[in-house]
Amino acid sequence: DGFESVWVTSMGHLMGLFDNEWLGIAPTGKMIFLRYCEFNKIEHGKITETAMFFDIPHLMMQAGLQPFLTQTAAHLVQPGPVTHDGLMFGEQDPKEGEKTLAAIDFMVNDMRDWKDAKKLPLVEELRRSWNEDMIWWGPAGIGATYTIERYAEQHSGPFRAAFTDRIFNGHLCRFAEGKFGGFFGWPNLTLTPTGEFMGMPTKAKPIDMRVIDMYRREGSKLTENWIFIDFLYFWNQQGVDILARATGIGMEDEPPN
């Protein structure tokens, strides 16, 4: 809508004691963190639309379940910005927001066609958009990684190798305020797997991916990135019920020998 609408975003963890079963996940009786990100559209002083994302596999792993076979990067409870300045309750310099949005757009456009053989090697391409000490706070199933070289090794390279065709479906919200910005789509991408992703076999048919990206800019480049991917929905399109497989809920009993 030409950046005419107003959106407010919140991201972090909901903390509590996991004392009751949830989605078939057995309680632990211990503290647990539910990673979330929400986008709220504001009209006439009231919320008119909300998009709410939860990293449910992240909670499952804290509860002792292993919903995925392997992770290429680190599993941890993800902190807020290194600069501890992510809470913005006052007006920000519009010029800083414009710089952040420009950095995000440059990165997205620079990687738009990852099959182009004439492009730079991956690490060199990433250096055009990212600071060397970048941190990529990825979702459960992939994990978090630090520095451009490790990001290329532990996520960006394997991700690009896992898919062939990529269709960009657009964003429902894309914004920047100060040194922070982000976007989400429903879905953002349609991808065709090449045969394996996250250590699991895939079928070569187009599937949708719902993604949230939140960024922090430092200087002229991006330096932190928090990612949410709806992997329960993603794998369900491949015929895999991650919740049922990890918890046993809804799974048919195996026939007797």
Listing of model-derived features with the role each one plays in the protein:
Residues 1-257:
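C-terminal and inter-domain tail/linker signature
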